[in-house]
Curated annotation (Swiss-Prot):
Alphabetized UniProt keyword annotations: Cell inner membrane, Cell membrane, Membrane, Transmembrane, Transmembrane helix
InterPro entries in the record: YldA-like
Subcellular location: Cell inner membrane
Main subcellular location: membrane
Entry keyword annotation includes Transport: no
Membrane topology classification: Single-pass membrane protein
Organism expressing this protein natively: Escherichia coli (strain K12)
Full protein name: Protein YldA
Length: 29
């Protein structure tokens, strides 16, 4: 159960990083 929780947290962090990177590139292009 803990492994699935850590996988979910890792996925959410990765998605947040991708979103921030896209917004940063759009604002600074």
């Amino acid at each position: 159960m803990a492994e699935a929780f850590y996988i979910l947290i890792g996925f959410l962090i990765m998605a947040a990083i991708i979103v921030m990177a896209v917004l940063y590139l759009e604002n600074h292009s």
